[in-house]
Amino acid sequence: MMLIFVKITSFLERYIMVRKFKSELVRISSESLPPQLRIEVEKQIITDVAHCMELVRKIENANISIYDKSLYTGKSVQNQFTTYNANNDDYESPYKTPKIKSNPSLDSSGSSHYSFIKAIK
């Protein structure tokens, strides 16, 4: 849900930016062009902005559909991110750190990953 909200706000920000750009172009063209040519320029600007907005809309839809396919495929995403216990009772999200119920590699000091970190260094 948050991703969709971010996508919508970024789309609105781009839309506002395009509208400001369009109004600035219309203002500049209004000052320096004869009336008939100004009307033609304004029509072209409106057409270009509409075309840009259509492209942005297509890109946004493509990104959302790609994201939906990769995130909500179920087992493939779960298998990719959940490499801990096969019991997914405490599964919340593939992006959160999983809760480890038991770790047989604990040493007497309670440090479970000391040897792994030492091996990396």
Swiss-Prot record:
Residues 100-111 have a biased composition (Polar residues). Residues 85-111 are annotated as: Disordered. It comes from the Eukaryota. This is Putative uncharacterized protein DDB_G0286001. It comes from Dictyostelium discoideum.
